[in-house]
Amino acid sequence: MGAFDGLRALVTGGASGIGLATARLLTAEGARVAVLDLAPGAPDGSLVRLRADVGDDGSVKAAVSSAVDALGGLDVLVNNAGVGAQGGVADNSDEEWHRVWDINVVGTVRVTRAALPALRSSAYAAIVNVASIAATAGLPQRVLYSASKGAVLSLTRAMAADLLPDGVRVNAVSPGTADTPWVTRLLDRAPDPAAEYAALAARQPHGRLVSADEVAAAVAYLASPAAGSTTGANLAVDGGMDGLRPRHRE
């Protein structure tokens, strides 16, 4: 018997990385799962795959409606879709600021807004927003990305307060540097990919990148009925990066 038997879940950015790992785990635990993505992939029988652009309200409304119809309702929403950005405070144009904010922050709002009517009808409603350790740790050359994920974290707590009377729990997961396609693309652009990989791994106290499956496990815990008294929380999956200051070994 799975933790999500009989439940219906929607995962944005669900075609790769953390989103796909989450969708697969929820499915393995008994949920019926729909994924929304710009490139959702070919039907495979295990997931409902729908194309959606979280930057477009019409696209979001249509895709969420199709997902709810296909699943027969909705119990869990995972807001995972997002884009990255590099640079200091003077490096990103206004256009890039607006684009990243529109996807990472307003995109979360759009999907949640469209899904709320169905979630309010569920006895086990849960929303999990994927934030980032960049929201709290102060990483170099991540000003825009950090600001957007900090907003997601604040949004999570405000949503949790507003939706508590409706029985909808809202939590966040903050991954450290994760082994995902976005990080792979970042490494591909680096002058020395091996050195950049080593640097990214070393900044986590446990000395390696976080896996997508580890983040998915945290999402699944917060989304499950077993976490029924947990709302407004942020669960870091970062190898201790945000809170630990271990001594360096000689």
Predicted regions and their residues:
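Short C-terminal tail/terminal secondary-structure segment
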Residues: 137, 231-250
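Alpha-helical segment proximal to the catalytic Tyr-Lys
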Residues: 117, 161-165, 228
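C-terminal helical subdomain
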Residues: 172, 180, 194-230, 235-239
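Residue(s) in the substrate-gating loop at a strand-loop-helix junction
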Residues: 132
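Active-site helix of classical SDR
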Residues: 112, 148, 156
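Short, small/polar-rich loop/turn modules that mediate ligand/substrate recognition or access, typified
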Residues: 78, 164, 169, 230-232
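Substrate-binding pocket helix/loop in short-chain dehydrogenase/reductase
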Residues: 88-89, 93-101, 200
